[in-house]
């Protein structure tokens, strides 16, 4: 048995392939897997930190074994947790903000809180030019999106996030 077969599920990693490769087109994203009931809080916190600091979707994987498990766990002191630094828009961007602009140094998009005057924008599902926000089908623009994905490996290695497995994105 397995997921969606009508049979009881067993411990397996079939969902991992779905998470890594089940998206439209070429759109890599960070995937974090909790390793134990005790690890769930840290994994969820780190997933939120990555999502908010890099404005990217992050998938957090758990399973029934972890969900039904239990272990002693001490609630962490919130002041001991690493700070989350969202990459917010600047006052200089007011009335000139587009959600496709990236910080030239970090390659992270700026985050405008919805409803702020001077930062209104419209999002769509088509690929946009990284500077203007106009619809783009140019190969160079598309290539630029893949160059940005390198931050995942750099971020994980700089922030002591354990990486299990190969650095090769084609290897599971």
Residue ranges and their predicted role:
Residues 13-14, 25-29, 53-57, 171:
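Short coil/turn connectors at secondary-structure junctions
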Residues 1-26:
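Flexible glycine/proline-rich, aromatic-decorated loop/lid segments
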Residues 2-9, 30-37, 109, 113, ...:
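Hydrophobic alpha-helical scaffolding
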Residues 2-4, 39-40, 67-70:
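Short, well-ordered, mixed-charge alpha-helical segments that flank or form enzyme active sites
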């Amino acid at each position: 048995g397995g997921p969606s077969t009508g049979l009881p599920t067993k411990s397996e990693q079939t969902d991992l392939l779905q998470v890594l490769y089940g998206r439209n087109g070429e759109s890599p994203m960070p995937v974090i897997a909790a390793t134990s009931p005790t690890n769930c809080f840290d994994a969820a916190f780190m997933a939120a930190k990555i999502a908010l600091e890099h404005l990217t979707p992050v998938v957090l994987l758990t399973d029934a074994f972890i969900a039904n498990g239990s272990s002693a766990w001490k609630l962490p002191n919130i002041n001991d947790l690493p700070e989350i630094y969202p990459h917010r828009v600047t006052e200089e961007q007011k009335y000139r903000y587009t959600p496709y602009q990236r910080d030239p140094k970090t390659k992270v998009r700026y985050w405008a809180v919805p409803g702020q005057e001077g930062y209104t924008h419209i999002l769509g599902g088509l690929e946009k030019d990284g500077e203007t926000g106009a619809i783009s089908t140019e190969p160079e623009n598309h290539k630029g999106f893949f160059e940005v994905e390198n931050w995942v490996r750099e971020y994980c290695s700089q922030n002591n996030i354990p990486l299990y497995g190969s650095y090769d994105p084609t290897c599971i």
